[in-house]
C-alpha cells in the first residue's frame, strides 16, 4: 500500500491537463481517494471543508463562481487553497477563473483540467487512487487470465502451478503473475491481483529456470492485472481423501473479507491440469450466466427416480 500519490503520477495516469503549477506536481501529495466538490464552500461555509482532498469544479461550481464579484471569488478560493490541498481540478474542458489560478499559485497548488464530464472524471480519478492507495497483500500462487476470467491457482510448492500456467499460456491465455501475487481490494466485492514489478511477465519452471513470457510468446500472452474471479487450489491426490465429484459443494476463500469462489482439483499423474482449469473457468462462467450442469443433472436424476418409483408402484398394483 502506498501512503500517497504525487499529483504528477495522477496527471500521467489519468491524462489530465496542467493549467498552472507544473512546478508543484511533485510536491503535492494525494493521501485520500475521496474527491470534494466544493458547493457549500463557494457560499462561504467552511465548517466541514475537506481540505485534504482534490477539489473538483464542474459546470455547476464554475457557473456559481462566475456569478460572484472578482474580489469575493478570490477571497473564497484563497480560503480553499490550504497547505494540504493537493490540487484544483476543472472538468468538461471549462476555463479556470483567473482568481483560481492566482489563489492556487500563491499556495503552490497546481490547477488541472480535463475534457471529461464531471461524474466520469470523478470516477476515473477515484478508481485510480483506490488502486494506488489500497492496502496490498502478497499471496503465493499463479494468476492467469482465462477467457477474460482471472483465475488464481494455489497449492503447495512443487505441485505444478507454474508448469500449468505455462501450458495455459501456450493455449492462448494470459499470465499476470507467477509465484507471488499482489492483491488489493478495489471495491466492496472486487479483488484485483497483479505481479510485483520485479516479477512482471516472468515464469519460473523447474529445470528451465526463469523465462520471460512476453519475449517468448508476445505481448498478447501477458496482462498487468486482473480481477480475481475464481481460485483453483491444486492438491496432491491421496486415496484416503474424498474430493467433490459432482461439483455440488460450493467453496469460497476470503481475501480482504471478500468471499471468492474456490474449487479444489486433485493432482495425479496423467491428469492434464491446464485443460481441467480451462474447463473449470468456462464452467464457472456458465454458472454465472445461469446454467449449472450439476443442478441440471440432479434435477434430471430426481425426475428419473420419481418416474421409476411410479412405474414400480403401477406394476405392483397390476399384480
UniProtKB/Swiss-Prot annotation:
Entry binding sites for Mg(2+)? 162, 204
Reaction catalysed by this enzyme: [HPr protein]-L-serine + ATP = [HPr protein]-O-phospho-L-serine + ADP + H(+); [HPr protein]-O-phospho-L-serine + phosphate + H(+) = [HPr protein]-L-serine + diphosphate
**InterPro entries given for it?**
HPr(Ser)_kin/Pase (IPR003755), Hpr_kin/Pase_C (IPR011104), Hpr_kin/Pase_Hpr_N (IPR011126), P-loop_NTPase (IPR027417), Ser_kin/Pase_Hpr-like_N_sf (IPR028979)
Q: How is its activity regulated?
A: Kinase activity is slightly activated by fructose 1,6-bisphosphate (FBP), and inhibited by inorganic phosphate (Pi), but FBP prevents kinase inhibition by Pi. Dephosphorylation of P-Ser-HPr is slightly inhibited by FBP.
> Which positions does UniProt annotate for ATP binding?
155-162
Q: Region (Important for the catalytic mechanism of both phosphorylation and dephosphorylation) spans which residues?
A: 203-212
Record flagged with keyword Transferase: yes
Q: Is Ribonucleoprotein among the key words of this record?
A: no
Gene Ontology biological process terms, A to Z: regulation of carbohydrate metabolic process
Q: What is known of its domains?
A: The Walker A ATP-binding motif also binds Pi and PPi.
The role this protein plays is: Catalyzes the ATP- as well as the pyrophosphate-dependent phosphorylation of 'Ser-46' in HPr, a phosphocarrier protein of the phosphoenolpyruvate-dependent sugar phosphotransferase system (PTS). HprK/P also catalyzes the pyrophosphate-producing, inorganic phosphate-dependent dephosphorylation (phosphorolysis) of seryl-phosphorylated HPr (P-Ser-HPr).
Q: Which family does it belong to?
A: Belongs to the HPrK/P family.
Query: What NCBIfam families does the entry give?
Result: hpr-ser
The miscellaneous remark of the record is: The truncated form that consists of amino acids 128-319 exhibits in vitro enzymatic activities identical to those of the full-length protein, and also forms a hexamer. Both phosphorylation and phosphorolysis are carried out by the same active site and suggest a common mechanism for both reactions.
Q: What is this protein called?
A: HPr kinase/phosphorylase
Which species is the source of this protein?
Lacticaseibacillus casei
Amino acid at each position: 500500500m502506498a501512503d500517497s500519490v504525487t499529483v504528477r503520477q495522477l496527471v500521467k495516469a489519468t491524462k489530465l491537463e496542467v493549467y498552472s503549477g507544473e512546478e508543484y506536481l511533485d510536491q503535492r501529495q494525494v493521501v485520500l481517494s475521496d474527491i470534494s466538490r466544493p458547493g457549500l464552500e463557494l457560499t462561504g461555509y467552511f465548517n466541514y471543508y475537506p481540505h485534504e482532498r482534490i477539489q473538483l469544479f464542474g459546470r455547476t461550481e464554475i457557473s456559481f463562481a462566475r456569478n460572484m464579484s472578482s474580489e469575493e471569488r478570490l477571497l473564497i478560493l484563497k480560503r480553499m487553497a490550504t497547505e494540504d490541498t493537493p490540487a484544483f481540478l476543472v472538468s468538461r474542458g471549462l476555463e479556470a477563473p483567473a482568481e483560481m489560478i492566482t489563489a492556487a499559485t500563491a499556495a503552490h497548488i497546481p490547477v488541472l483540467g480535463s475534457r471529461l464530464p464531471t461524474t466520469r472524471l470523478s470516477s476515473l480519478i477515484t478508481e485510480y487512487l483506490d488502486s494506488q492507495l489500497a492496502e496490498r497483500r502478497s499471496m503465493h500462487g499463479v494468476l492467469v487470465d482465462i477467457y477474460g476470467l482471472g483465475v488464481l491457482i494455489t497449492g503447495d510448492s512443487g505441485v505444478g502451478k507454474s508448469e500449468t500456467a505455462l501450458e495455459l499460456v501456450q493455449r492462448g491465455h494470459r499470465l499476470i503473475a507467477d509465484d507471488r501475487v499482489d492483491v488489493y481490494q478495489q471495491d466492496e466485492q472486487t479483488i484485483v491481483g497483479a505481479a510485483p514489478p520485479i516479477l512482471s511477465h516472468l515464469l519460473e519452471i523447474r529445470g528451465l529456470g526463469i523465462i520471460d513470457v512476453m519475449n517468448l510468446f508476445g505481448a498478447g500472452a501477458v496482462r498487468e492485472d486482473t480481477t480475481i474471479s475464481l481460485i483453483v487450489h491444486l492438491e496432491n491426490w491421496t486415496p484416503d481423501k474424498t474430493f467433490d465429484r459432482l461439483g455440488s459443494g460450493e467453496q469460497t476463500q476470503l481475501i480482504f473479507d471478500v468471499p471468492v469462489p474456490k474449487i479444489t482439483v486433485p493432482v495425479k499423474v496423467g491428469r492434464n491440469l491446464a485443460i481441467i482449469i480451462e474447463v473449470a473457468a468456462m464452467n464457472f462462467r456458465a454458472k454465472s450466466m445461469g446454467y449449472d450442469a450439476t443442478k441440471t443433472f440432479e434435477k434430471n436424476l430426481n425426475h428419473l427416480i420419481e418416474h421409476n418409483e411410479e412405474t414400480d408402484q403401477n406394476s405392483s398394483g397390476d399384480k
